[in-house]
Amino acid sequence: MTAIGDTAPSFTLPDTEGLDHSLETPAVVVFTCNHCPYALAWHDRLAAAARDYPDFHFYAINPNDAERYPRDSLEAMRERVEREGDWPMPYLRDESQDVARVFGAMTTPDVFVIDADGRLRYRGAPDPDHQDPSLDAEWLRDALNCLRAAEDVARPETDPIGCSIKWKQ
């Protein structure tokens, strides 16, 4: 599990078009999926943050076991991206679940902010309430604003809120 201040693990994962993406910093890594109501509720807020912070590389990673949850298969991910259009971040598949494990991801969503030096600076929920769009991913945005200002993140960790990651058995 990666702790606040630790060097973030590197990764290379395929997106919905089969292109590989490797971690570039500074970054926001969001473990997410296609079926969790929490992940779906926060998706637009996270996409808006990706558009508002082009100086950060955003990655959406789906680690769920697609055999038990076919709605999280690479094909279903591809269909979702095509249906919704204009995703401002690559949607990556963590088939082995190794990336989710080394980060210590627990839920969808689970957000990790990595600074330009590759260190984990924030981990947790995008904001306090998935049902309140007016919160606009405020915890994530606060962390990104602190990094932009070269300040310590005031709230470096919050409890991730969402559906448990569906681990392979």
Residues covered by each model-derived region:
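Chalcogenol-based redox active-site neighborhoods
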Residues: 1-148, 153-157
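Disulfide-stabilized, aromatic/cysteine-rich ligand-recognition loop
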Residues: 151-169
